[in-house]
């Protein structure tokens, strides 16, 4: 196969914000009909956020769009970058459309990937659904029934409202925080509640 390399951003992933999501999404969408697959290398700190946002900004892609990175730089003797790239290329050659994250022998839907470990090579987990693919000595094994497929046209939507706050509840969360957020004129509050959505209603209610 032929490879084409394009530099989009040179930025520590801790600084990837909604403005950069827009740059990345536009770059992908412009070339989406020119290639059989697109692989994006990305720092691991915010890669799951970017993969998820691109999943919503570019809907119904007909080609694989895969994010990957590494815990150690590619020049390090113990780097995980090479195998992660191999996993990404294996997914790229599958021809299955969608946005994915390839890391430590797992292929995860972009909307399901979360970084849960800071230094381990097994840094990402697939939340509330199994990984859609595994790379091992047998090659790439996909569970295609877990990958959403649509006959709809590929669409691009870059209307991002970044004035939304995520509030993670703890048993000691002070409800006055909500008033502060309203005064700050946030346009949306997402409450990460307990379990399946429980919120305290005694004292701190």
Regions found by a protein language model. Give the residues of each.
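Accessory alpha-helical/coil subdomains and C-terminal extensions
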Residues: 1, 109-196, 201-202
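ATP/NTP phosphate-donor binding region
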Residues: 1-29
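Short, small-residue-enriched loops and turns at beta-alpha junctions
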Residues: 12-15, 74-75, 196-199
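Charged helix-capping and loop-helix junction motifs
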Residues: 20, 81-84, 202-205
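Structural motif
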Residues: 36-37, 188
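Short beta-strand segments
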Residues: 40-42, 66-69, 100-105, 168, ...
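Short Gly/Thr/Asp-enriched flexible loops that form oxyanion-binding sites at enzyme active sites
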Residues: 43-62, 199-205
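Internal gly/pro-rich beta-alpha loop/helix module
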Residues: 67-136
